[in-house]
């Protein structure tokens, strides 16, 4: 090499150049020399970095001077937009959209400005050098330092339309700082969440692909996959040469022009060859791929190609599965979790802006199909319906005419100019939609609410409301046609419920004039009593007494115990009642006032209650007790219950044992009665111990007496030779001594039908209303209820209940009457206190309130005096609502809605303009700001013309004709809001609204960036093969598209007409937009609407197309389509984030997801329907069936997500160590699975050497240790006690010369096709065992059978 000339190149070496340099050295000179070179480069770099001492100081941050003008231009544009919004030319959504796009554009422009400024003024600036050499930082960070920080998103992903205009060099304002922190926090949180997600993704990937190891040199397949450059629209994401590097050619590559072979089949493609192929202009190359490799359970060397780490063919035993998993998982952290839902996409990504190259005139050809279209900024433009061209005719310059320029516009483009328009150089002509499948702009429906900025009256202009009722009967009003909603200003008052207006439309009110009043009326009438108002607090309550009753027979005494007063009432016949309601409280109708103090119905213990003849009211609240309707007898069978809840070991007696009173039944618990013990326990916890008093009668013949269980024994009846003297209750028990009957005592309580307490009634004189204290008897327990208690309980309570006769209350919504309990001294004897019940209605007065934003001030006046007697319905007080400002009353609505409103049109709402010329407007017109009212006179604000007066006419002089006419135009201020068609209206024409009320919900479509779920979630969705949320519609068969339009121009369905005339209908759901124009031809499996494709559906469509070559070819074809789809989609996501991953890694993973099929019908094979089997395995079995003439297995290809695939691997050890351990292991145990220890995981878990890398040959290479002779092998086997429980480990495995010539005759070698080499180990050992050791025959047969089955399963 010495004689060659040294080449010197002068160029800047930045990060990219360095990369190329090292990779070139690596491919040409190998690892060692590259390492030395890299080391030298490092030293060089450090040396000069030290010399240069590059650092960033504040002075290095140079802000481009053009920033100011850029910002001013943006603000100007935004001001213009704001004016258009104020004038009602664009909707709120369009304004927001425009603001965001403007700022985005400015931010981008500023970024470019920063770069050029650095380049021109100071290319050695340290910031510039660092960012652009790739040493540290990138352009987006530099932009924040010296450009502008830009727009931030809030935590919901909505963009805040207030940009951060400053950069970190200038410093942020307080507002900007807070918004900035708001957005930055989101970034941090996202990153934290991301790492966990990405780690889990890597784990799943490793699990699904860990057993993919290079095991063969060449599988010999002729299939391959076509590779073409990956493009998005017109820009190439991955060049063909990049995609080809390191692959092996699958079919000869032919030069398109010279037709000579550039690369023969099975040639690995090196860097140079890849470039050569690309240079030759080959469109696509068929390469071998892991997806089409036919090696069983692995990938062969040729199908995998280069190991990218060494740039040479991959070695045998390389664990490519794990490498693939790590390659895909590692960049996961770099992917963004979610893209921001911007309200709309930044145009740069979806449309390409076409600007005119020169001044000239635009001509739109007649055949260019366009329709008018409103852009998302509310501008009018033309929407191109089919591909075509527009022509720019340049202006003549001197003598020669430059050639007209043709501009191609694709379907879906937007043209911003009209035919014949003059354009300047650099003017925006159109946005051309980029073709290509991936950029079908997905749109989603979103809503934005518009709130009113001022109070006033609603007036619709051009808005056509339309009502729809859905199935639930909710009606929504939408705008069928868009238009303006005007709010004409005025003061709106919310009237309280029940207020009556005292003014009419058109009345004039003064400031503090009365608008409305509410009256406070009494319902029941009676005597007015005003409680003594405490000083300084005006009276709020007015009480009206309607009836009262005094218990004149009873006296009240007070006993106080423990600081609480108990009031006892003693009646004439010395019955003592306890007052339940204390004096001074209100008692509602039906509430208990007092309770009889009575010991007759008290029991000593708990027990069991039965009713004999007693009837209670069915409907009654259990907590109040049940009212007795019919008297009778209560039968009480006492028993004492101890609730224990302790450990069973503390029990000192047995179940069924008879105990004396005072026995300790449980530690520290003694029983009070003698009787039989019943113990309830649960889980060795003692729940309760019941002692049932009574006598035990032993029984010899349980059958005879079992019928007496739970019966009553009447006095005089005989039982087991004893005559009963009193009523007993008989129960059958199993005591420790044997079966017995327990005869239990019964206590009887007589209950009278009517209580022996008089009821008191009183009738009010004025109103004829009656009030009474009714005595009732109440039982707290139901029939046959068990009362668990040790102490006694009350079985019957006699209570006095207040009942007010409510006559005719129902017509006016009566406040339920309450009675006040009061103690009054007896008129004759002052020492005796009597109980008085007073029924009163209390009315609360409104407080006077000062005016607030929505209500006028109120004033309340009282109309009655203390002690007046008033009739029902008379007015007690009235409240007046006063207006805040004078004006004219308008918009009083008829109707009785909950909130009634009225509007006062104030003087401040109107402006009057004088003009000498005749106005061009008339009263009632709605005008926007800037409208010309009369020649030379313009409106300053929007509103409605109220009046046009001619002031000059009043002159009565003769020369009236000559005098200048004076006109006065009065405008009522207003505010227009534009409404887009389809918006949901939340108000009606003529409504009155307060400031801040919602007017409409604007429904708009916002484009999703490529896909809202970018990044990790999208990759997870693809690899887990989830169905996307809004999947697109796929054409099941190819054909011509016909679009069916419903009412309006909404496409509602698509028809696809096949070549043979078959028509398939595809209805379009809401939010699905056409992707195919009318009349275009689609191949099968092509999306008809936009949205992500559902991979399962792709598989189904292509599989259902069928194929002449049988089901295997068909399944392979369908799977290949899905595989290509998945590989490309995953690549798309990584590419959009600027991450390069070699296709082969993704292919290895996708192969694992698509290698299974679901058996539909097993035919004559041993496979069961529903079983998941590898495609190649089924095919082998089917070939065997074809030879023997059996029925083949029918199957459908399935796509498994990585988790599913991991759980469905052949190796149960691997699956169990991944997820759902118990399920996997139990299934494996039930099915009697064997694990052939093929993958890495299984071997690691068991502790063997892993079959990859250096450990690969240990299990696979024949004739490793030839010095062991066959005889020794036998002796090794003889030493094992039971040949069937032999464990293979590394040391013993090596001792077997497994492929010695002597074994060939046993007939194993001819099964090679079905078996994998690994399997031979186990089988041949078994064969040795069979040949040379006497084995029990039956065991052997079983073993054989198992083995056969296993082969079927495994392979």
From Swiss-Prot:
SUPFAM superfamilies: beta and beta-prime subunits of DNA dependent RNA-polymerase. Gene3D superfamilies: 1.10.132.30, 1.10.150.390, 1.10.1790.20, 2.40.50.100, RNA polymerase Rpb1, domain 3. One of its GO terms (cellular component) is DNA-directed RNA polymerase complex. Residues 1331-1355 are annotated as: Disordered. DNA-dependent RNA polymerase catalyzes the transcription of DNA into RNA using the four ribonucleoside triphosphates as substrates. It is an enzyme of class 2 (transferase). It comes from Trichormus variabilis (strain ATCC 29413 / PCC 7937). In cyanobacteria the RNAP catalytic core is composed of 2 alpha, 1 beta, 1 beta', 1 gamma and 1 omega subunit. When a sigma factor is associated with the core the holoenzyme is formed, which can initiate transcription. The keyword Transcription applies. It catalyses: RNA(n) + a ribonucleoside 5'-triphosphate = RNA(n+1) + diphosphate. One of its GO terms (biological process) is DNA-templated transcription. The lineage of its organism: Bacteria, Bacillati, Cyanobacteriota, Cyanophyceae, Nostocales. GO terms for molecular function: DNA binding; DNA-directed RNA polymerase activity; zinc ion binding. Zn(2+) binds at residues 219, 293, 300, 303. Belongs to the RNA polymerase beta' chain family. RpoC2 subfamily. Pfam families: RNA_pol_Rpb1_3 (PF04983), RNA_pol_Rpb1_4 (PF05000), RNA_pol_Rpb1_5 (PF04998). Its cofactor is Zn(2+). InterPro entries: DNA-dir_RpoC2_beta_pp, DNA-dir_RpoC_beta_prime, RNA_pol_Rpb1_3, RNA_pol_Rpb1_3_sf, RNA_pol_Rpb1_4, RNA_pol_Rpb1_5, Rpb1_funnel_sf. The keyword Heme does not apply. This is DNA-directed RNA polymerase subunit beta'.
């Amino acid at each position: 090499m010495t004689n060659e000339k040294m080449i010197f190149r002068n160029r800047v070496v930045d990060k990219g150049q360095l990369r190329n340099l090292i990779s070139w050295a690596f491919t040409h000179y190998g690892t060692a020399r590259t390492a030395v070179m890299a080391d030298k480069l490092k030293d060089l770099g450090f040396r000069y970095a030290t010399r240069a001492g590059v650092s960033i100081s504040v002075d290095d941050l140079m802000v481009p001077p053009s920033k100011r003008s850029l910002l001013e231009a943006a603000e100007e544009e935004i001001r213009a937009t704001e004016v258009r919004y104020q004038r009602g030319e664009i909707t709120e959504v369009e304004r927001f959209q425009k603001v965001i796009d403007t700022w985005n554009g400015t931010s981008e422009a500023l970024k470019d400005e920063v770069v050029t400024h650095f380049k021109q003024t100071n290319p050695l600036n340290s910031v510039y050098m660092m960012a652009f050499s790739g040493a540290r930082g990138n352009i987006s960070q530099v932009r924040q330092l010296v450009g502008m920080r830009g727009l931030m998103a809030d935590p919901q992903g909505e963009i805040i339309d207030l940009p951060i205009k400053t950069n970190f060099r200038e410093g942020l304002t307080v507002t900007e700082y807070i918004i900035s922190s708001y957005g930055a926090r989101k970034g941090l949180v996202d990153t934290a969440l991301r790492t966990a997600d990405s780690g889990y993704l890597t784990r799943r990937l490793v699990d699904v692909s860990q057993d993919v190891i290079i095991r063969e040199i060449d599988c010999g397949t002729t299939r391959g996959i076509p590779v073409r450059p990956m493009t998005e629209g017109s820009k190439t994401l991955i060049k063909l040469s990049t995609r080809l590097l390191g692959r092996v050619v699958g079919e000869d590559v032919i030069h398109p022009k010279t037709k000579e072979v550039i690369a023969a089949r099975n040639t690995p493609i090196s860097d140079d060859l890849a470039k050569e192929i690309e240079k030759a202009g080959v469109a696509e190359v068929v390469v071998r791929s892991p997806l089409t490799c036919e090696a069983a359970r692995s990938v062969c060397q040729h199908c995998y190609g280069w190991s990218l780490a060494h740039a040479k063919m991959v070695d045998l035993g390389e664990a490519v599965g794990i490498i693939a998993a790590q390659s895909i998982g590692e960049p996961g952290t770099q992917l963004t979790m979610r893209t921001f839902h911007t309200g709309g996409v930044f145009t740069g990504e979806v449309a390409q802006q076409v600007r005119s190259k020169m001044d000239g005139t635009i001509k739109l050809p007649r055949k260019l199909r366009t329709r008018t279209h409103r852009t998302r900024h509310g501008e009018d433009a033309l929407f191109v319906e089919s591909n075509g061209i527009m022509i720019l005719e340049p202006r003549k310059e001197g003598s020669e005419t430059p050639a007209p320029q043709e501009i191609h516009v694709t379907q879906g483009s937007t043209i911003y100019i009209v035919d014949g328009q003059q354009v300047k150089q650099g003017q925006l002509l159109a946005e051309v939609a980029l073709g290509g499948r991936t950029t079908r702009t997905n749109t989603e429906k979103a809503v934005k609410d518009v709130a009113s900025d001022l109070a006033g009256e609603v007036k619709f202009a051009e808005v056509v409301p339309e009502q729809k009722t859905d199935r639930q009967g909710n009606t929504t009003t939408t705008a069928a046609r868009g238009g303006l909603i005007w709010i004409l200003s005025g003061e709106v008052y919310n009237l309280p419920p029940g207020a009556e207006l005292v003014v009419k439309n058109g009345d004039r009110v003064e400031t503090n004039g009365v608008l409305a009043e509410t009256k406070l009326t009494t319902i029941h009438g009676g005597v007015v009593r005003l409680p003594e108002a405490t000083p300084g607090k005006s009276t709020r309550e007015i009480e009206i007494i309607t009836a009262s009753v005094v218990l004149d027979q009873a006296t009240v005494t007070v006993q106080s115990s423990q600081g609480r007063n108990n009031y006892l009432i003693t009646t004439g016949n010395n019955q003592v009642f306890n007052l339940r309601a204390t004096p001074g409280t209100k008692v509602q109708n039906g509430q208990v006032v007092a309770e009889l103090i009575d010991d007759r119905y008290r029991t000593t213990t708990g027990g069991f209650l039965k009713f004999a003849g007693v009837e209670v009211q069915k409907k009654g609240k259990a907590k109040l007790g049940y009212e007795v309707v019919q008297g009778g007898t209560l039968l009480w069978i006492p028993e004492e219950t101890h609730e224990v809840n302790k450990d069973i070991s503390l029990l000192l007696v047995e179940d069924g044992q008879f105990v004396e009173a005072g026995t300790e039944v449980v530690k520290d618990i003694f029983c009070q009665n003698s009787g039989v013990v019943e113990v309830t326990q649960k889980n060795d916890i003692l729940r309760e111990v019941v002692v049932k008093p009574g006598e035990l009668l032993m029984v010899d013949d349980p059958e005879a007496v079992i019928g007496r269980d739970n019966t009553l024994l009447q006095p005089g009846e005989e039982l087991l030779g004893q005559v009963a003297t009193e009523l007993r209750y008989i129960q059958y028990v199993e005591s420790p001594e044997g079966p017995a009957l327990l005869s239990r005592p019964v206590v009887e309580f007589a209950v009278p039908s009517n209580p022996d307490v008089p009821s008191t009634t009183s009738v009010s004189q004025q109103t004829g209303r009656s009030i009474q204290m009714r005595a009732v008897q109440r039982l707290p327990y139901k029939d046959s209820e068990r009362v668990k208690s040790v102490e006694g309980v009350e079985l019957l309570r006699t209570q006095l209940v207040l009942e007010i006769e409510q006559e005719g209350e129902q017509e006016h919504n009566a406040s339920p009457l309450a009675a006040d309990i009061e103690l009054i001294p007896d008129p004759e004897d002052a020492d005796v206190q009597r109980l008085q019940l007073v029924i009163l209605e209390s009315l609360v007065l409104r407080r006077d309130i000062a005016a607030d934003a929505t209500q006028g001030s109120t004033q309340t006046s009282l109309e009655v005096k203390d002690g007046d007697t008033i009739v029902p319905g008379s007015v007690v007080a009235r409240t007046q609502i006063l207006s805040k400002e004078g004006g004219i009353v308008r918009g009083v609505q008829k109707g009785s809605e909950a909130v009634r409103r009225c509007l006062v049109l104030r003087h401040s709402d109107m402006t009057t303009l004088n003009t000498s010329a005749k106005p061009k407007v008339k009263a009632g017109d709605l005008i926007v700001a800037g409208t010309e009212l009369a020649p030379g006179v313009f409106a300053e604000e929007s509103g409605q013309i109220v009046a046009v007066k001619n002031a000059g006419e009043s002159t009565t002089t003769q020369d009236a004709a000559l005098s200048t006419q004076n006109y006065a135009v009065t405008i009522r201020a207003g505010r227009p809001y534009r409404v887009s068609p389809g918006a949901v209206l939340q108000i009606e024409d003529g409504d009155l609204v307060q400031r801040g009320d919602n007017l409409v919900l604007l429904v708009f479509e916002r484009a999703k960036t490529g896909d809202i779920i970018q990044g990790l979630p999208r990759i997870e969705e693809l690899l887990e093969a989830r169905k996307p949320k809004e999947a697109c519609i796929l054409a099941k068969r190819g054909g011509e598209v016909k679009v069916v339009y419903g009412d309006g121009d909404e496409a509602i369905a698509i028809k696809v007409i096949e070549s043979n005339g078959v028509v398939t209908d595809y209805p379009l759901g809401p939010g699905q937009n056409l992707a195919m124009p009318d009349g275009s031809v689609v191949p099968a499996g092509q999306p008809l609407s936009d949205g992500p494709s559902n991979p399962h559906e792709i598989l189904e469509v292509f599989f259902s197309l069928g194929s002449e070559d049988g089901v295997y070819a068909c399944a392979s074809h369908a799977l290949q389509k899905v595989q290509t789809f998945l590989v490309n989609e995953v690549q798309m996501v990584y590419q959009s984030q600027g991450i390069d991953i070699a296709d082969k890694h993704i292919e290895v993973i996708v192969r694992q997801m698509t290698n299974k099929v679901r058996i539909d019908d097993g035919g004559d094979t041993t496979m069961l329907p529903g079983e998941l089997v590898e495609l190649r395995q089924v095919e082998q079995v089917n070939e065997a069936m074809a030879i023997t003439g059996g029925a083949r297995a029918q199957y459908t290809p399935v796509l498994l997500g990585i988790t599913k695939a991991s759980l469905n691997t052949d190796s149960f050890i691997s699956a169990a160590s991944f997820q759902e351990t118990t399920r996997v292991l139990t299934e494996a145990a039930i099915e009697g699975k064997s694990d052939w220890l093929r993958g890495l995981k299984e071997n690691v878990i068991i502790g063997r050497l892993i079959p990859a890398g250096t450990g690969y040959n240990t299990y696979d290479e024949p004739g490793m240790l030839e010095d062991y002779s066959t005889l020794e092998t036998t002796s090794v086997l003889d030493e094992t006690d039971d040949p069937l429980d032999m464990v293979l480990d590394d040391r013993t495995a090596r001792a077997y010369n497994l492929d010695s010539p002597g074994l060939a005759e046993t007939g194993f070698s001819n099964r090679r096709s079905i078996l994998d080499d690994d399997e031979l180990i186990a089988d041949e050992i078994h064969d040795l065992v069979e040949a040379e050791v006497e084995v029990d025959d039956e065991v052997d047969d079983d073993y054989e059978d198992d083995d056969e089955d296993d082969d079927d399963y495994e392979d």
